[in-house]
Amino acid sequence: MERTFAMIKPDGVRRGLTPEILARIARKGYRVVGLKQMVIARETAENHYGEHRERPFFGELVDFITGGPVVAIALEGENAIAGWRAMMGATNPANAAPGTIRADFATTTGENVTHGSDSAESAQRELALFFQEGELLA
């Protein structure tokens, strides 16, 4: 079984989308092995988005993700990384396939409701960044 990191971003939490997104996860058969609502510390956000540090939008990205509560989720299941990314849809909601979370709920590329690890390495790093040892179910 594969694990991945998923996040409902501040825009999704603010708009009350958490129950719908969790229901979609359950319908797909993924197991939630960790879940917590939190406000991300600036340092954590900077580490999380470290690959974008030199990009012009980095400051806006960090401000957005730390600007309200998020729901951090550890998912487990068959092909969880690719499967969750398929459920989310393209980063730009205009390019997201119908029926994906971003096509259904995202308003802009910046406020696109969800995040998901893009590789096994990213998943491992992001899970360790957001969950302490003992917080994930075996």
From Swiss-Prot:
Family: Belongs to the NDK family.
Gene3D superfamilies with a match to the protein in the record: Nucleoside diphosphate kinase-like domain
Gene: ndk
UniProt-listed InterPro entries: NDK-like_dom, NDK-like_dom_sf, Nucleoside_diP_kinase
Name this polypeptide is given: Nucleoside diphosphate kinase
Species annotation: Deinococcus deserti (strain DSM 17065 / CIP 109153 / LMG 22923 / VCD115)
Signal peptide: none
Reactions listed under catalytic activity: a 2'-deoxyribonucleoside 5'-diphosphate + ATP = a 2'-deoxyribonucleoside 5'-triphosphate + ADP; a ribonucleoside 5'-diphosphate + ATP = a ribonucleoside 5'-triphosphate + ADP
Alphabetized PROSITE patterns for the sequence: NDPK_LIKE
A Pfam family this chain is assigned to: NDK
